[in-house]
Amino acid sequence: MMNRELSWLKFNERVLNEAGNPAVPLAERLTFASIYQSNLDEFYRVRVGTLMDQMESKEVVRENKTNMTSEQQVKAILQETRDLDQKKAAIYEQLMGELEPKGIRLINFNKLSAEEGKLLETYFDNEIAPYLSANIVSKQQPFPFLKNKDIYAVALLETKGGKTRAAIIPCSNNVFRRLIDIPTRKGTFMLSEELILHFLPKMFKNYVVKEKSLIRVT
């Protein structure tokens, strides 16, 4: 007998499988990929959130069918999600590959030429950087409120004295576009959050950026 939460993840995996099914039209597969991620976000927000609350309460709550504790369920969910993330990444690459012949391509910064990199740096400086606000977490500056489903760049910074700080930069903004055209390549785009992450060191010139990543809160 399968745990209810793990059973739901299996259901959502079937949605993901449709996104990777070559027999399904490409537009529908993109829709299935979007539905899969939206479902997973809601699952973590509601059901995993409830399990985490139960763990915080210190009360041992067991699931009726399998007798699993909240902690056991969360561990099992995380493991299952890691496996699904690998599958999702492979399907994403497959979908992106099929979009290229149709004139649509998402590109990473490291795939750009030096000239293209300079063009995007100018775009970042003029069109994006003025609208970004960095939050450095410290005892004097408490952890900021993170909005549900918004994208954030996070960084681990090191001061000249060797101390570490954490920084959070909201990347979701109605002022600048999320899809940035690469002017030298027709139909080629970059996500604004990828550009922000690449040029993150420009925002922290008095620090060394030791690590950086993108996160999204659910």
Language-model features, listed with the residues they occupy:
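N-terminal non-catalytic structural scaffold regions of very large proteins
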Residues: 1-218
